[in-house]
């Protein structure tokens, strides 16, 4: 096997286990907040977004289909972290609004996530991290624009 194909195979083989390991690591860091990684990510994303985003936009940012975000939002809403309201411009759609508790929790989750990333990347050269980020972005673009063989 040519070296470039071996490197590509090695790189892609590591993506899923790395994502799973990172998720487990973040789950442990967020455990004290009594949120799953999915819930914490949704609350953090909502904290970063404009108040009153539509469910569909949150689903898109989470990388899931629209209906898949409903149980997650149910959980977040039951916890008192967010509320859904009818969209004033489209009564069929719902908008999501973080509560005060949701905004506070989003800030805590962001802080813990920042601490985790700082520790994980402390010994990695910034230039190497920039290259790795560019490579991941290029792979993502290639996946979006190419057909499977």
Across the structure, where does each feature detected by a protein language model lie?
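Short helix-capping/hinge SLiMs at alpha-helix to coil transitions
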Residues: 32-33, 47-50
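N-terminal leader segment of winged-helix/HTH proteins
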Residues: 1-33
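A short acidic, leucine-rich amphipathic alpha-helix
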Residues: 57-59
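C-terminal regulatory/oligomerization modules of transcriptional regulators
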Residues: 1-7, 127-149
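Short alpha-helical "packing" element that flanks the helix-turn-helix/winged-helix DNA-binding module
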Residues: 42-43
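Charged, amphipathic alpha-helical coiled-coil/dimerization segments
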Residues: 23, 54, 74-134
């Amino acid at each position: 096997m040519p070296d470039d194909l071996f490197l590509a195979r090695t790189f892609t083989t590591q993506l899923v286990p790395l994502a799973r390991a990172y998720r487990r690591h973040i789950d442990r860091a967020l455990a004290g907040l009594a949120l799953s990684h999915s819930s914490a990510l949704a609350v953090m994303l909502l904290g970063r977004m404009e108040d009153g985003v539509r469910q569909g936009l949150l689903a898109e940012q989470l990388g899931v289909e629209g209906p898949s975000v409903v149980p997650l939002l149910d959980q977040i809403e039951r916890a008192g972290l967010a509320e859904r309201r009818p969209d004033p411009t489209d009564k069929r759609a719902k908008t999501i609004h973080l509560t005060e508790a949701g905004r506070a929790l989003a800030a805590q989750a962001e802080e813990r996530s920042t601490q985790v990333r700082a520790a994980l990347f402390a010994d990695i050269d910034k230039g190497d991290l920039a290259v790795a980020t560019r490579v991941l972005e290029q792979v993502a673009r290639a996946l979006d624009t190419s057909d499977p063989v």
